[in-house]
UniProtKB/Swiss-Prot annotation:
The gene is SYF1. This is Pre-mRNA-splicing factor SYF1. Residues 311-326, 526-540, 1070-1081 have a biased composition (Acidic residues). Involved in pre-mRNA splicing and cell cycle progression. The keyword Signal does not apply. The lineage of its organism: Eukaryota, Fungi, Dikarya, Basidiomycota, Ustilaginomycotina. InterPro entries: HAT, HAT_Syf1-like_N, HAT_Syf1_central, HAT_Syf1_CNRKL1_C, Syf1-like, TPR-like_helical_dom_sf.
Length: 1081
């Protein structure tokens, strides 16, 4: 538009405003407003220096002359403009004294007369410059910024600070996509400015500024910064409504039409902010236009829709309630369309997120978006969803379409389904690009049930509890309680987790309680009111009471069904859970029909390879159920305190069904269990059942059938899981053990021997089986066959298993024959010791030596004991030497033990060598060989630390006091110092270690009580801490008994010879802690 035409329009507007002001009534406030308004206009028409002498002060005449001489020199114009800004514009000028505070606030930056003059001077110089340079962008930009400062106010921190803020925001946020709207909701645009001209008082200046922007855009229509600056003016809170509504919307549209598409998002950023501040239908239409270009901000648009919908739900005043019906209907229709539009948009976003074509700017998952849609549906059920009858018609129509036309898309709505009171619509057009369920402008309501089933339950099975309760809540909000109940029941029957079940059940129970409470309150209120028609009232009340009784009964049944419903959930989650099936049987109590049905269903559904442990127990319990005549028989059998006669009476009263039980066992033995032992347990329990009912022959036939091998047994391994358990069952030791026990109890000797021989043939017999077989033959007087079984056993097994067999074998052989077959016994002992490990030699050697002592030669016994000192392990060698010495002393005398002591000292470890030296020295002293004893003490001293092994040094000290001289005593002290230097270590560390060990041993002795009464207590100096520590360590380290009976080591012996034990007990006294060895003689 040309400038002259705009000036004429502005003058017309000014005259009209003046006429309105003149026609208004006079008042103090209006007088103040009129006084302020009279100051305007300042810039229209443009200030002319020829008509206003104040525009050019005397100091600026030289600059004016420079412009006259060089009118085309832009630098001269720029210098003059900078001079006027620096000399006239003040950032925060004080207002005029004649103005009140209120008037100064209305005028803002123009409250000072100097600033009004500065505005006129700036306008004059810029307009004259633009007449020379109408297309210069920098000139227009500076002019608009300076003019805007007088109208909009000063930016916070000044223009430089605002420029920095804009640059920083541009770096942090991109002008596209989800970050398009970066301002906080309800943010005031005016907070970025300080002050500003009131839109009513300074209407002329606001209009003049808008006209200036229009002129700039007429000359520079493609400059985006000019457009953005102009559009930002409409967001200012003091912008006049005449500019900030229709004019602003049209200006935004012109900007979008003028600027290229690459700059549109920068315009939309301001446009959408302006639309949100305007609100109403304008906001919705602007947002819809933008979402066609960029749907990424759909969530923001949905929040705007819901905010407007909630604003319409606010309580209205009495006057608004009295409006005509047409207007209220129109309002409800508009609000309903907003809720429906928001619902369809959210549904579309959720589906897009599920397909992976949409990512929420707020980081919401597809399920969160779907739950938001569900919550919106719960909040506005009448406006969004179909009625139950309409949903049924929808389903029928979908089925008809599928059968007639082959259509599989169940989401298409039939043409007869529409909102209440609307005309029929077509199902969908073939050319339509949007689905009716996600087309926001389509008024067709949604089939909520079908959507939740297809988009929710089928895709978010782990959140089914929330979805089912949401659907039920939707029907409750619509008043469809029966449909809600069916929904709860359907949810309970389909969920697979206890969490979802609990969520649904709690909501179901709470809803039932609320409905019952409401009906009871309603009946109570009706009982207090007096009605005219008593008969109708009575009939209505009876119907309501009947309905209340029905609902209360349903609620009680629901509470009673809860354990079964929880069990249903657990079985749906894992139908192979055997324990849950057992719990289900227990829940049915004495309902035999349900119990049988449950057992059969469990057997049918459980996969043996995936079943939890004890799947076989399910068959056993089922068989026992039939065996004892159902749940009543089982309950009587499990009752406590029942006598034998009472049990017989109960057995007579409740007859079992053995044929059905046998059928269950027949079914069980065909199941491919994971473990062979489970199948073996089935066979064993089957035989046990036959035994309980005195069917002994049937029991033996059952076990013989169970161990029957397959035709081809080659290559079958018991632990080969690739083969079915039925194929590997014939190698089950558990099954054979039960079979052989059954034969021993009910069969004859020959049949039992055949079973044992079959086990040995299959090489599945254990050492215990060998011993049991031999014991069975021995009990039946087959002694030699028993010994043959032992021989076969030691050939089958190696050590350490063979040790147990040898131990029992040798004990029984010696007990049977004694010295009658001595050479054979010797051969057996030599055979046992041939490959025996060192740790198992001691019991066999002691038994061998005892045999020679009792039935053979003492000399051979001594050789055996001497051989044992070399054959046994290091841990047993000391005890073996002590035993050997005791036997040698008792047989040949004390002097004969000297070579044994010498060999012991050479072969034993250092710690045991010192102990053996003490014994050797005591022996020599007993024989009167004092010098030999002293030499032995000196030899043993090198192994004894004086700090820790004080017993040795005390004994040597006492020995020297009693038998030595001053020289020998000094020699003993010299050796002690030498040894102490040899063991030179940290004394404090040793003391701490010894003290800790002593405290630990003392605590153990305190727990043992009086059992440690044999420990000797030495006299200890109470003032010496080291002595107390050593005494405690010495007490804790008390020596054990010197001799070990052979029977104590033979742990696997089935029966031990008491003679060996007696000898061992007698021998334990020999070589003990006694100083006197007269007991050896």
């Amino acid at each position: 538009m040309p400038p002259k035409m705009r000036s004429s329009q502005e003058n017309v507007a000014v005259s009209s405003d003046a006429t309105i002001q003149a026609s208004s009534a006079s008042s103090p406030l209006q007088d103040a407003m009129a006084a302020v308004t009279s100051l305007f206009p300042l810039t229209s028409p443009f200030p002319d220096p020829a008509k206003d002498d104040t525009l050019i002060p005397a100091a600026d005449i030289l600059l004016e002359q420079e412009l006259l001489r060089n009118p085309d020199n832009f630098r001269s114009w720029s210098s003059y403009i900078d001079h006027i800004i620096n000399t006239n514009v003040v950032k925060r000028p004080p207002p005029d004294v004649s103005l009140t505070t209120y008037q100064a606030a209305l005028l803002g930056p123009l409250a000072s007369s100097t600033q009004r003059t500065a505005l006129r001077r700036l306008t004059s110089i810029y307009e004259r410059a633009l007449a020379q340079f109408p297309t210069r962008y920098s000139l227009w930009r500076d002019y608009l910024q300076n003019r805007s400062r007088f109208v909009l106010g000063d930016p916070k921190g000044g223009s430089d600070a605002k420029r920095k803020r804009d640059l920083q925001a541009a770096r942090e946020k991109l002008d596209f996509g989800p970050t398009l709207i970066d301002s906080v909701e309800d943010e005031d645009f005016g907070s970025a400015y300080r002050g500003g001209l009131d839109g009513t008082v300074g209407w002329q200046e606001w209009k003049s500024l808008a006209a200036l922007y229009e002129r700039a855009l007429m000359w520079l229509p493609t400059m985006p910064r000019l457009w953005l600056s102009y559009l930002s003016m409409f967001i200012h809170p003091q912008c006049p409504p005449i500019l900030s509504f229709t004019h602003a919307r049209r200006t935004f549209d012109r900007a979008l039409r003028t600027l290229p598409g690459s700059l549109h998002l920068r315009v939309w950023k301001v446009y959408l902010k302006w639309a949100e501040r305007r609100g109403g239908e304008t906001c919705l239409r602007v947002w819809r236009r933008y979402l066609r270009v960029d749907p990424s901000l759909t969530e923001r648009y949905v929040s705007i829709l819901l905010a407007q919908r909630e604003d319409q739900d606010e309580p209205e005043g009495e006057e608004e309630e009295a409006e005509d019906d047409a207007q209220s209907d129109r309002s409800r229709k508009q609000s309903g369309s907003k809720a429906l539009e928001a619902s369809k948009l959210l549904l579309g976003l959720a589906r897009s997120a599920m397909d992976g074509t949409y990512v929420s700017p707020e980081g919401k998952s597809p399920f969160q978006l779907f739950v938001e849609w569900l919550e919106l549906t719960e909040k506005y059920p009448e406006e969004i969803g179909l009625d139950p009858e309409e949903e049924k018609k929808y389903l029928q129509h979908s089925v008809a379409l599928t059968s007639d036309n082959g259509m599989t898309n169940a989401r298409r709505a039939p043409r007869h389904i529409q909102g209440k009171g609307t005309a029929a619509r077509e199902i969908a057009k073939a050319s339509s690009s949007k689905h009716p369920e996600t087309d926001a402008l389509d008024p067709t309501r949604l089939n909520v049930t079908a959507i939740i089933q297809k988009d929710g339950l089928d895709k978010f099975s782990d959140q089914s509890g929330r979805l089912w309760t949401g659907l039920a809540t939707y029907w409750i909000k619509r008043g469809e309680f029966d449909v809600a109940r069916d929904t709860f029941e359907a949810g309970i029957q389909t969920v697979k987790t206890v969490r979802d079940f609990t969520q649904i059940f709690d909501a179901y129970a709470e809803t039932s309680e609320n409905v019952i409470a409401f009906m009871m309150d309603e009946l109570t209120e009706e009982g207090g009111d007096e009605e005219a028609d008593a008969e109708d009232q009575e009939e209505t009340r009876e119907d309501k009471e009947a309905e209340l009784d029905r609902r209360m009964q349903e609620f009680e049944e629901l509470i009673e069904r809860r354990p079964l419903l929880v069990n249903d959930v657990l079985l749906r989650r894992n139908p192979d859970d055997v324990q849950e099936w057992e719990k289900r049987v227990m829940l049915y109590g004495d309902n035999d029909e349900k119990i049988i049905e449950t057992y059969r269903e469990a057997i049918q559904k459980i996969n043996p390879r995936k079943a939890t442990p004890n799947f076989h127990q399910l068959f056993l319990n089922f068989a026992q159920f039939y065996e004892y005549g159902g749940s009543a028989g089982l309950a009587k059998r499990m009752a406590e305190g029942v006598e034998g006669q009472e049990e017989e009476e109960q057995a007579e009263q409740v007859e079992g069904d053995l044929e059905s039980a046998r059928k269950i066992f027949e079914k069980a033995i065909t199941i491919p269990f994971r473990r062979v032992d489970d199948l073996a347990e089935i066979w064993c329990e089957w035989a046990e059942m036959e035994l309980r009912h005195s069917n002994y022959d049937e029991a033996i036939r059952t076990m013989a059938r169970s161990v029957a091998p397959p035709r081809n047994t080659k290559g079958i391994q018991y632990h080969d899981d690739t083969l079915p358990p039925q194929t590997r069952l014939f190698k089950s030791l558990k099954l054979w053990s039960f079979y052989v026990d059954l034969e021993e109890s009910l069969g004859d000797v020959e049949s039992t021997k055949r079973v044992y021989e079959k086990m040995l043939e299959l090489k599945i017999a254990s050492a215990q089986i060998i011993i049991n077989y031999a014991a069975f033959l021995e009990d039946n007087k087959y002694f030699e066959e028993s010994f043959k079984v032992f021989e076969r056993g030691v050939e089958l097994f190696s050590y350490p298993v063979a040790f147990e067999i040898w131990n029992v074998y040798l004990s029984k052989f010696v007990k049977r024959y004694g010295g009658a077959k001595l050479e054979r016994a010797r051969d057996l002992f030599e055979q046992a010791l041939d490959k025996c490990p060192a740790r198992f030699c001691k019991p066999l050697m002691l038994m061998y030596g005892q045999l020679e002592e009792e039935h053979g030669l003492v000399k051979r016994a001594m050789k055996i004991y001497e051989r044992a000192t070399r054959a046994v392990s290091t841990d047993d060698r000391f005890d073996m030497y002590v035993f050997y010495i005791a036997k040698a002393a008792a047989t040949f005398g004390l002097a004969a033990t000297r070579p044994i002591y010498e060999r012991a000292i050479e072969s034993l470890p250092d710690r045991q060598t010192a102990e053996m030296c003490l014994r050797f020295a005591a022996l020599e002293r007993k024989l009167g060989e004092i010098d030999r004893a002293r030499v032995i003490y000196a030899h043993a001293s090198q192994f004894c630390d004086p700090r820790t092994q004080t017993d040795f040094w005390k004994e040597w000290n006492q020995f020297e006091i009693e038998t030595g001289s001053e020289d020998t005593f000094r020699e003993m002290l010299r050796i002690k110092r030498s040894v102490q230097a040899q063991f030179n270590t940290d004394v404090s560390y040793i003391a701490a270690s010894a003290l800790a060990s002593a405290q630990q041993n003392q605590a153990q002795r305190g727990a043992q009580g009086s059992s440690n009464g044999h420990v000797r207590e030495d006299d200890v100096d109470a003032s010496d801490p080291m002595a107390r520590v050593e005494a405690a360590s010495r007490s804790a380290g008390a020596r054990q008994t010197a001799f070990v009976a052979a029977s104590t080591a033979a742990s696997g012996a089935r029966s031990a010879d008491t003679t060996i034990g007696d000898v061992a007990k007698n021998d334990e006294v020999v070589g003990g802690d006694d100083q006197d060895d007269q007991d050896l003689l």
